[in-house]
Curated annotation (Swiss-Prot):
Domain CBS as annotated: residue spans: 220-281, 284-341
Protein name per the record: UPF0053 protein YugS
Topology class, membrane: Multi-pass membrane protein
Similarity-based family: Belongs to the UPF0053 family.
Compartmental location: Cell membrane
GO molecular function annotation: flavin adenine dinucleotide binding
Length: 429
């Protein structure tokens, strides 16, 4: 009889382990992976899909199974081990009153140890590491158990919902829990630290989060740096100009940059030139879209995709041209700098010279500088480090140094209030 009871104890521990493994596995498994297995014809995947589609109900089934086996183990385990150990401790000569206490304590420790280690911790570890295999293996038995205990599960869930409502709360299902952006960033950081994703993946996803908060003004090519073609130029003059500038698309202006009429693609100009066609620039000019400089980058990209236009002109609040944005500028916000064969000699946007020591393009965003140097430059009206430096001192030239925010800002290249490059060193730590 004692042997049968010991066997029953280990069976209960085994059943507990199955429910614990099932609980962690169905939470851990990815729905996309299950869908792939369904497409490959795995019948077990259909059962697993049914479970993760009704996750709350099946988690309740797991919890009910764990509770039932735990109660059975508590009812059978300690008395059985106590009867098994009592004769052994009697042989040691321990007086009977103390013998009973010692036997009870040791039996309780043994049952607790077996339950926690074999019934909880070990299956949890296995199911987290092998969530897919465990989910497929346990899916059909768990569905059978759910069907058998369905009335109890419904009664327990209903009672729990009624109880929490009495205290003014609402029951929330697992699939209704929303993860915030900050929580996603923390999960991403932990995955990167554990080596589950590489540095490029970590950087791309972070940039996607930041992308949603960007406005076009922050990534534009400013008005002063726009290479344009005048409508009055001949085809030959325009071609000579694009050979020097080496861009693909150019805004076409009339009189000045506040009057942009359209865009010309260099391919169209070369085609017309080599065919010997006597045409004017307005005949090969394409339409251009104009948007306010504060438009979110995401909205601008959608519009450019919809209208199949690669360049947009940004307009300031007074109606003048503020700058332009290309599709490449937008994509670079996610994937980083894109360089072609004509960009070989360009200085990187941000060049690290040492610890807390950088050389930056004047168009570098203040947010980027703050993140790199762990400082807090604040100016809601200014986007770039060059703009902020001009608020500190309007007449800046190459070689000038400004000390602010615990950093040294040295102007490396500037002309007519246009700061091209600045060297920044953090001096206060």
């Amino acid at each position: 009889m004692l042997i049968l009871q010991l066997i029953a104890i280990f069976v209960l521990i085994g059943i507990t382990a199955v429910f614990v493994a099932a609980e962690f596995a169905i939470v851990k498994i990815r729905g996309s992976k299950i869908n792939q297995l369904i497409e490959s014809g795995d019948s077990r995947a259909l059962a697993a899909h049914k479970i993760i589609s009704n996750l709350d109900e099946y988690l309740s089934a797991c919890q009910l199974g764990i509770t039932i086996t735990a109660l059975g183990l508590g009812w059978l385990g300690e008395p059985t081990f106590e009867r098994f150990l009592h004769p052994l401790f009697t042989m040691t000569g321990i007086p009977e009153p103390f013998n009973h206490i010692v036997t009870f304590v040791v039996a309780f420790i043994i049952v607790t140890f077996l339950h926690v280690v074999m019934g909880e911790l070990a299956p949890k570890t296995v199911s987290i590491q092998k969530a897919e295999a465990v989910s497929l293996w346990i899916a059909k038995p768990l569905i059978w158990f759910y069907k058998i205990t369905y009335p109890f599960i419904k009664a327990l869930n209903g009672s729990a919902s009624f109880l929490v409502k009495l205290f003014g709360f609402h029951s929330v299902k697992e699939h209704q829990v929303v993860i915030s952006e900050e929580e996603l960033r923390l999960i991403l950081s932990e995955s990167y630290e554990k080596g589950e994703i590489n540095q490029s993946e970590f950087r791309y996803v972070n940039k996607i989060f930041e992308f949603d908060n960007r406005v076009a003004r922050e990534i534009m090519i400013p008005r002063t740096e726009i290479a344009v073609i005048s409508l009055e130029q001949s085809l030959e003059e325009a071609i000579h100009h694009i050979i020097n500038e080496r861009y693909t698309r150019y805004p076409v202006i009339k009189d000045d940059k506040d009057h942009i009429l359209g865009i010309i693609n260099s391919k169209d100009m070369f085609k017309a030139y080599f065919l010997g066609q006597p045409i004017k620039l307005n005949q090969i000019m394409r339409p251009v879209i104009r948007v306010i400089e504060s438009i979110p980058v995401q909205q601008l990209l959608i519009r450019m995709q919809k209208e199949r236009i690669h360049m947009a002109i940004l307009v300031d609040e007074y109606g003048g041209t503020a700058g332009l944005v290309t599709v490449e500028d937008i994509i670079e916000e996610i994937v980083g700098e894109i360089r072609d064969e004509y960009d070989q000699d360009e200085t990187p946007h941000i060049l690290k010279k040492g610890e807390h020591h950088y050389v930056m393009d004047g168009k570098a965003l203040i947010d980027e500088v703050n993140d790199l140097l762990d400082i807090a430059i604040e100016n809601e009206e200014i986007d770039t480090i060059a703009g902020w430096l001009l608020t500190q001192k309007m007449e800046l030239k190459a070689g000038d140094v400004i000390h602010a925010e615990g950093c040294e800002f040295k102007i490396l290249d500037a002309e007519d209030h246009h700061i091209r490059f600045v060297e920044i060193k953090k001096t206060d730590f």
